Amino acid sequence: YEEVERLKHKHVDKVHLVGNPVRPEVLVLRDEDYPAFTEDGLLKVLVTGGSQGARVLSEVVPDGLAMLPPALRQRLQVTQQCRVEDLERVRERYRAHDIPAELGTYFEDMEVRLADCHLFIGRAGASTIAELTAVGRPAILIPLPIATDDHQAANTREMVKAGGARMIRQPAVTIKEVTGWDDKDNRTRVAQADAFQKLAKDISLQIQAMAMAPQTLANAAHAAWNCGRPHAARDLADLVESFGGIDLMDVIRVGGDNHQRTTETAQAAGLANQDRAA
């Protein structure tokens, strides 16, 4: 990202911004158009919470979508990743709201689903941000509140400032695990229920702000795309190469002119070490 925190001033001139490399199967989607979203067409929403899913999204996203105006709610097509223990409960919630949703604990073809969606809802890890901006997908981001140094919130800044995403804070009370039934625990449960309700409402309001007019969502997609750094892997490799001389690069580059000689030298050194050990 452009902004680097806790960096000593004397090191500012040494900073090289390359971005976060993304998978090739995601990167190829960068040149594809944002899927058409019309006044009466489907609104395809992709919801994920990282590799293990995020329980809070299972709690609040179905209810938030149900709060949308009927004209928009009836056009929803949802794909959501859930934890295995939440799957049936979330399915029942979508069924009760009469919202079509495909649920799963893991999607192997996530790049296909990312390409097909109009709007992403999820956490704000660095890899997620990199993929969203590489492809150009607008997002509602809910940073993990217990992330070290609040780094997920920091991850959202560039995308939010550009207009490619909206960020919603998850109240800390929602992550507390309550197992008892004393007065304090019951008060916490009430506070959690209120916080979940507010979070669902915030999601609904942000979706309306982005999706009630098709052009607004398309503009957000373009803004997200402009934040992408598609050449991160190449730029990082070039930067690493710039630190070394020719001999070092021959070791690093598989297939370099001296690769065979380097390999033979390493093998010979290994045999010599074996002889000494014997």
PLM-predicted stretches and their roles:
Residues 1-29:
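Active-site-proximal region of nucleotide-activated glycan assembly enzymes
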Residues 2-8, 89, 128-129, 149-156:
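Short, glycine/polar-rich helix-capping loops at beta-to-alpha or helix-loop-helix junctions
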Residues 4-15, 89-96, 113, 132:
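Short loop/helix-cap segments at secondary-structure boundaries that form the rim of catalytic
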Residues 25, 162, 166-230, 242:
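Leloir-type glycosyltransferase catalytic cores
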Residues 31-120, 153-157, 161, 168-182, ...:
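Donor-nucleotide binding loops and adjacent catalytic segments primarily
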Residues 104, 123, 141-142:
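A short structural motif in glycosyltransferase catalytic domains
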Residues 115-130, 137-138:
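Acidic donor-binding loop of glycosyltransferase active sites
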Residues 192-193, 209-278:
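C-terminal amphipathic helix plus adjacent low-complexity
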